[in-house]
């Protein structure tokens, strides 16, 4: 079977994203597991980062399997990828990745923002204890979404598009299908809304803090200002990956793009950039992770 230029380009992009994603997410898992072995316990943020690494690792594997079948086994793609088992895994890892990213943004917002409201301060001092419960809630929410999603007969819907020739029938089927998909995935808008709110709060907090510093210390930037800026850079980068994945994911689930077209493969590439790029930013924004990653690279070079 001859491969189109779009398919070849997709293979190259996916291979690069897959290798990057497996490396950086595997690193997050290994580093935190090593800390667990050494100290017999983990800080809440370390647990969160390890969970993020595991969820990204799983999502990267699922997306790679999808790409493999779409390129090399197109006839089996619909039956395998939109079957109950693979659909459950895809929806579960997509949902839990978004929820864990939201938990991380909440952590940054509570720890760094300078709001003094009583409710905010109450959450700020209790966030370490709340993280395990947030992670458990994320898992339960993701399992629920994935369980509902497998009830939608995706494979049948996609095959109907290929078999039907009547424009009216095809349009009715497509409208029904999109309605089902959007209804099922409506729950994913909730973590997106929380993420946007946390990013906005960090922006407001940075503006207020900078304004106070300019009037009180003639523009001197202290450690708190640097923490605000670094956290904001990280969260905004997260936000870009978050939005791009969410938009590509929702577009993909409407089946509006021609199968194996250039746009189809591009959508898959955008989705695969999220679990790898997101974790790269986590490592780059943490000096300890940077040092550990450099040490691992040096060991590999010596070997």
Swiss-Prot record:
It is a multi-pass membrane protein. Residues 32-56, 101-102, 151-185, 256-277 are cytoplasmic. Residues 1-10, 78-79, 124-129, 207-234 are extracellular. GO terms for molecular function: bitter taste receptor activity; G protein-coupled receptor activity. It comes from the Eukaryota. Keywords: Cell membrane, G-protein coupled receptor, Membrane, Receptor, Sensory transduction, Taste, Transducer, Transmembrane, Transmembrane helix. One of its GO terms (cellular component) is plasma membrane. The chain crosses the membrane at residues 11-31, 57-77, 80-100, 103-123, 130-150, 186-206, 235-255. Pfam families: TAS2R. It is found in: Cell membrane. Bitter taste receptor that detects natural and synthetic bitter compounds. PANTHER family: TASTE RECEPTOR TYPE 2. This is Taste receptor type 2 member 2. It comes from Homo sapiens.
